[in-house]
């Protein structure tokens, strides 16, 4: 039996983890800069906040590309093969990753273009929580498939 029947090719795995790491790091850095006491000068935002968001947005474009790559190859192949093998438990975490990716894309779009000021903080925290959850789920999903 093949040990890693539907494992991502090396370039996809590296690109996915690198993109995810940049998105997670820039998102968490923005939270620290924005909400940490003394992080900003009074009412003015920290000078690095804008650059952090620009890098986060750039990484998000790469993340959407990688989501498309994975959705086009890994997801269908993994779905078909997991029904016949011991990797059926991977379906749940794979579906959760797809749902979180869609939620992050939608909430990021809403935050950037449409979020009213009254909803912006709650939507931002939901986006942040989903991002951290997706990072944890991605590591868990990858480790399960390598076992």
Each language-model region and where it sits:
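Membrane-embedded alpha-helical bundles that constitute the cytochrome b-like, heme-associated redox core
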Residues: 1-147
């Amino acid at each position: 039996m093949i040990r890693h029947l539907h494992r991502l090719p090396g370039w996809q795995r590296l690109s996915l983890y690198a993109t995810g790491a940049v998105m997670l790091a820039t998102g968490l850095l923005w939270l620290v800069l924005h909400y940490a006491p003394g992080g900003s000068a009074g009412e003015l935002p920290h000078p690095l906040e804008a650059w952090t968001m620009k890098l986060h947005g750039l990484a998000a474009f790469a993340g959407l590309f990688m989501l498309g790559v994975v959705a086009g190859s890994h997801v269908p192949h993994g779905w078909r093969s997991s029904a016949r093998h011991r990797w059926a438990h991977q379906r749940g975490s794979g579906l959760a990753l797809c749902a979180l990716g869609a939620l992050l894309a939608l909430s990021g779009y809403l935050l950037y273009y449409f979020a009213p000021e009254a909803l912006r903080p709650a939507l931002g925290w939901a986006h942040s929580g989903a991002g951290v959850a997706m990072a944890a789920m991605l590591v868990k999903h990858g480790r399960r498939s390598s076992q």
